[in-house]
UniProtKB/Swiss-Prot annotation:
This is Bis(5'-nucleosyl)-tetraphosphatase, symmetrical. Keywords: Hydrolase. It comes from Burkholderia thailandensis (strain ATCC 700388 / DSM 13276 / CCUG 48851 / CIP 106301 / E264). It catalyses: P(1),P(4)-bis(5'-adenosyl) tetraphosphate + H2O = 2 ADP + 2 H(+). The keyword Ribonucleoprotein does not apply. It is an enzyme of class 3 (hydrolase).
Length: 282
């Protein structure tokens, strides 16, 4: 997407169907009409108003840049008959909506990564061996595969934990699966980039030998600002080249947004409480 505004974008954490909290935060921010709005994935699921949330973001048109999160992909997988609804899911209202086909098509055409103004947005994270160029190349491969006529077969093959680490020698299906898992699922990895998918607590809960993906030594995206969500137990975290946005709104905590000024010291945080957007425990 090319810039159509000189205003810095505002990036929102995982909405997960918390429509009222999003509307409250949007009103608090009161962005100018040409301010780009970024969404770090997981627009839907577990919150009480997934359909209204999705329709609202779709209605923003090209102003909205939303990357795919694991819950958005779960919506696609259920719509495609690859997965079934799970306890706590709130995407059934989307699937039953009269405009369901249009909404599913919109989600299916979202990117896995977005790079603009020296900032790279993904849902979950990146592997240490990837620089920004390789991450965008892999995101493009995934995006093109999900936009193709055989997207259902492709999506079915993306689910799975193996292989759990990157190699430039990976063949097509394995290459896409590793990228899929890094972009949408990763929290912890080894210093060498082997992913772990069970632990979902904060950084202190890292299994032995693992660390948060963004603390992997020699991470090749350390020179760009990475914007991401996904990790509610991590919470809002700002470093010079890191913006973590998921502060657990759907769990009754807070919804966060950050105005992404080019100067890290000028970035502005806005939050609202989410007491009325509590999801059932997993």
């Amino acid at each position: 997407m090319t810039n159509f505004s000189s205003s810095p974008p505002i990036a929102f954490g995982d909405l997960q169907g918390c429509h009222a909290a999003y509307r409250q935060l949007f009103a608090q921010l009161s962005p100018a009409a040409d301010t780009p709005l970024w969404f770090a994935g997981d627009l839907v699921n577990r919150g009480p108003a997934s359909l209204a949330t999705l329709r609202e973001i779709v209605g923003l048109g090209e102003r909205a840049v939303a990357v795919l999160g694991n819950h958005d992909l779960h919506l696609l997988a259920v719509a495609a008959g690859i997965r079934t609804l799970k306890p706590g899911d709130t995407i059934g209202e989307i699937l039953d909506a009269p405009d369901a086909d249009d909404l599913i098509e919109w989600v299916r055409h979202r990117p896995f990564a977005h790079f603009e103004r020296g900032m790279l947005m993904v849902h979950a994270g990146l592997l240490p061996q990837w620089d920004a160029a390789l991450a965008l190349e892999l995101a493009d491969e995934l995006q093109r595969a999900l936009r193709a006529p055989n997207w259902r077969d492709t999506l079915r093959g993306l689910y799975g934990n193996d292989p759990n680490c990157w190699s430039p020698d990976l063949k097509k299906a394995d290459r896409l699966r590793v990228a899929f898992n890094a972009f949408t699922r990763i929290r912890f990895c080894t210093p060498e980039g082997a992913m772990e998918f069970r632990a979902n607590g904060g950084p202190a809960s890292a299994p032995a030998g693992y660390l948060p993906w963004f603390d992997a030594p020699s991470r090749k995206t350390a020179d760009v600002t990475v914007v991401f969500g996904h990790w509610a137990a991590l919470g809002l975290m700002l470093r010079e080249n890191l913006v973590a946005l998921d502060s657990g709104c759907v769990w009754g905590n807070r919804l966060s947004a950050v105005r992404l000024a080019d100067d890290p010291a000028a970035r502005e945080v806005a939050q609202v409480a989410c007491e009325r957007c509590g999801a059932a425990e997993e």
